[in-house]
Amino acid sequence: VLALRAGWSWVIDRFRWLGAEVLRRIRSFSGGNRVPPGPIKHVFVLVLENRSFDHMLGFADISGRDARTGHPTHVDDLTRGGPHANPNPNAADRPVDASRPAVFSLAQKRADGTHPPDPGHEFDHVLLQLCGYTRDQSAKVVLPTHPDPGDDYPGIDNSGFIASYMGLANRDGVVSNTTDPESIMRCFDPAQVPVLTALAKEFAVCDRWFSSVPGPTWPNRFFFHAASSGGLDDSPSGFQSATASLLDGYHFENGTIYDRLEGSRYDWKVFMGDEFPQVFAIRGMTARRLEGHFRRFEEFAEAVNDPEFSVPYVFIEPSYGQVLPTTSKDFTGGNSQHPLDDITNGERLVKQVYETIRNSPHWNESLLLVTYDEHGGFFDHVAPPRTASPGDSISSPENNHHGFGFRQLGVRVPAIAISPLIPKNTVDHTTYDHSSLLATVESLFGLEPLTRRDAAANKLDHLLSLATPRTDAPTSLPEPADSGIVRDQVGLAEESSEDGSLTAIQRAFLHVAFLRHYRETPLFRKPAAIRAFQRIEFRSQANGFMQEVHRRMSSARLRVAAKRKSKRTSGGRRA
């Protein structure tokens, strides 16, 4: 079976490569790639990790002009109304209010030498966070029930964030006394996130942008690419059988935005912060890497500053850091703003992306969206609304864990739309989710929607209301705050004697590494590669595998770079 699967996967890859080559030749005869018809020629997207709106901007106290009416308005945040609190399961008479400041990284050691845990954000966790809990007559905790197949999601009051953080989402009725319940309610002071705050005040802050799924990273990031998760409602699993998802990556009935762009002769690029970008989990992406659609983020500034840069759609993947380290902590050392990493690294990434575009020759024709995939378990006070189901098929039945119908949005996340065509200090109260990005791109570039979700989604077009580009947008942003974090404060220097099992999200990133490795593996060795991957159970095994794949990918990249340099040098000599 493994041999047949591997062989069929190899055949599909060859046909995909051949189709891409034919398409390139057709484009060369038909004048190459198209240029978008409207004033926006370039859409840039930066999606960070696991932070709620209130957690990042809840105390920013932003006033401005309503994007729809032009009237004075205020962001829906923690500085108005209230109380904004959650009940404490261990002290029902003492609710915990949202407060500031937050810690720069949850991996920072506390006074007792321990680390706060990473907040839960799987489907069960979010169900509890949004719907809260009750107690029966014997004072036993009663958790919310799963939505039925008809997707009748329970009533939402955003009251279960502390309960989830203290362990109730384990569904064992046990309330932990070891977790500081206030951690999940703490939000950043504007001085801690000066880059994000400056952009929110300078351009358009969207205070009703919700994650597309009340769940974790993987399905939410898929919605950015496909307006669907193909039925995935939790972190992936099911890698113990030779499924199509394992060997080829995830697929979607109606394809992705990249298929739509290519079908209309629009170019696109993904700039990746490390060797294992999440988008590689999508079928065909590892092959598209060979077609020149993927570049390292280190090349971003040079590419965008080229006067000939003509890519209409750019998606930026952050560095996710030490996803599978040999220490007990994960996600440290990146710039994705994962809760276990130093948030100022992500602030620095946002600053770099903005300043590169702002000072490039293409600024006047650009739109940049900075947002987050999901809330990461952190408190937000706004109840997410219902929405349209994508209406496509479930592509991987083994990954539809809860029978979820995708008619309920997830927790609110920060979103800032940035362009010289957007008036300064705009506040947008329009309801959005991640498929709104695709609806906007489809509107700007004349593309058809992918699913019912993006067909029904609100677009960002109305924000681009200026007839001529602004000239007062800052050319530089404030420096990120000083977190005071050094390497040994986030657990990177302490070796762990534990070799625990992989979490669902760790296995998902491991799968991305496998897909990269699998594409480079000769056909006769593919069955053995599959078996080796399926035998990985513990962090040490996964860490060794990913380090080896990283080494191979880095070596291959250096070889390609050397060849390019050699060609440029020889071309110069011929000239």
Question: Each PLM stretch: what is its role?
Answer:
Residues 2, 8-575:
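N-terminal pro-sequences and low-complexity stem/linker regions of secreted or lumenal proteins
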